[in-house]
Regions:
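Flexible, gly/ser-rich surface segments that form the specificity/activation loops bordering the active-site cleft
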Residues: 247-304, 318-329
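C-terminal cap/linker of serine protease catalytic domains
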Residues: 149-175, 248, 274, 315-374
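Catalytic-histidine neighborhood of serine endopeptidases
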Residues: 193-235, 242
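A conserved glycine-rich beta-strand in the N-terminal activation segment of trypsin-fold
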Residues: 175-202, 220-222, 304-307, 353-355, ...
């Protein structure tokens, strides 16, 4: 209850930070050097880098209340993302980008968050505005290059440095040892069984492969290949059993039947990078059956192993390799629960906006990292 109350207060505290005293000139410079504020920012950054998003949020909020400045606000945004609060991070980043136009950091982070959240056109407009104000800024140039060169985009180099980071920090679950340095991205995968297992393309795994999975919050756990499942194997898929349960948050898995052809749909996937990352959302309309199989056409871009979500943000399936040039997906459906006695007729959930879809699915898709032992 305490955690829910604290999270619910983040938006109000962010608004309070926006209304903090606007110091100017020498006064602002002096306030920025206040020992207490400097210590708070350093502690918050340390908490963030070790994956303690809750503590980092608290300390960045306190620093933001002391001075209306971009450094604490950017920390708040990254801490909110580390905590899975995409919508709050996006809303506050819009403020930071608009208020602190003298520096490119807020604008390029806003462009990145818009892009991974499926709002490509708005992301391009924001980034173009940043480049117009700061044409020689190396951070803006690096973001421009990353967003233009790959889809989904992959952060590397300057974009993984602490002060400019466009990704979460890694955090091992259950005090496990981290993956070794040679571990490489092999595929996307989808969390199932309430976060105890993951489904992925079997082709991503070798015969002597050690495996880890990592979500969009940087949370990481080792995994092992489960016994063969005929229904999955027939579609070239395999199941991983996770060493530690990976939280799925408010995300739901579909039960009953798959969405009808022509229904709005989304895919959430990571780019082919080895570092922690925020996944990217793509959207369109789900297609119909592929010939006489139980596969369906995706109808829009989606990387193999990506999570397929319906218009309510519910996990409905996993993307597969292209068939006849078209991306396909396989429904992953649970049996319908037995109706409870005396229950009222179910009410269908309302459709969600893309930022809600992203936040709902953020914990459902994972990076698969592998090393091949001799």
């Amino acid at each position: 209850m305490l955690a829910r109350t604290r999270r619910g207060s983040v938006a109000l505290l962010m608004i309070g930070a926006c209304g903090a005293l606007h110091a100017h000139g020498d006064e602002a410079a002096a306030a920025a050097r206040l020992p207490q504020r400097v210590a708070l920012l350093a502690r918050a950054q340390s908490e963030l880098e070790r994956g303690d998003a809750s503590a980092a949020l608290d300390d960045f909020e306190r620093a933001a209340m002391m001075l209306h400045a971009a450094d604490a606000e950017l920390g708040l945004i990254r801490a909110a993302m580390q905590d899975g609060q995409y919508r709050r991070a996006l809303a506050f980043c819009a403020h930071t980008a608009g208020e602190h136009v003298d520096a490119a950091d807020g604008g390029v982070l806003y462009a990145w968050l818009l892009r991974v959240g499926g709002q490509s056109s708005q992301s391009s407009r924001v980034l173009a505005d940043v480049r117009a104000h700061a044409p020689e800024d190396p951070l803006a140039a690096a973001v421009d290059h990353a967003l233009a060169s790959r889809s989904p985009p992959v952060a590397n180099g300057l974009l993984l440095e602490s002060s400019h980071r466009m990704a979460p920090w890694p955090a091992m679950l259950a005090s496990q040892a981290p993956p070794p340095a040679p571990a490489r991205f092999a595929s996307n995968a989808v969390l199932v069984d309430d976060g105890d297992a993951a489904v992925l393309p079997a082709s991503a795994l070798g015969t002597n492969t050690r495996v880890w999975v990592r979500n969009g919050l940087g949370q990481t756990t080792a995994a092992t290949l489960a016994a063969s499942d005929a229904s999955l194997a027939s579609h070239g898929l395999a199941r991983l059993v996770l060493q530690a349960r990976m939280p799925v948050g408010d995300s739901k898995a579909a039960a009953g039947r798959a969405p009808f052809a022509g229904s709005p749909g989304y895919a959430l996937q990571f780019g082919r990078g080895d570092a922690p990352a925020w996944p990217t959302l793509t959207q369109g309309f789900l297609g119909g059956l592929v010939r006489d199989s139980d596969l369906r056409k995706l109808g829009f871009d989606g990387a193999t192993g990506a999570a397929v979500l319906d218009a309510n943000g519910t996990l409905v399936g996993i993307t597969l390799a292209a068939a006849d040039g078209d991306a396909t997906w396989l429904p992953l459906l649970s049996p319908l629960p037995a109706p409870s006695t005396g229950s009222s007729a179910p009410v269908g959930p309302s459709l969600l906006a893309p930022d809600q879809i992203y936040e709902s699915g953020l914990r459902r898709v994972v990076q698969v990292l592998v090393t091949n032992d001799p």
